[in-house]
Amino acid sequence: MKDLVAKRYVKALVDGRDLNSVALISEKLNEVSKAFKSDKFNSILSSSDINEVEKTKFILSMIDKADKSLENFIKLLGEKRRLDIIPEIAFELKTQIAKM
């Protein structure tokens, strides 16, 4: 299920962008997806004591020099309560780049 949702987000992310822009976004999302391997990180994201806005800000703080489109994308994921699919999105984005 997460894979299907991730594919839709990747399609929206890739449409209208050149390979260099997509590769840069992929690099940034890969940095964040590595954090999902940490139990502490996952406990923060799954905590009901922390609202989605704060979780989104937390993830954005991990991304060095995020461009506005990536920042808006992460905010959208936060609003839709989909921050947990960032690793799937990063994987699908790598797959999509290989096809470009």
Locations of the language-model features?
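Elongated, mostly alpha-helical coiled-coil "stalk/stator" tethers of large membrane protein machines
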Residues: 1-100
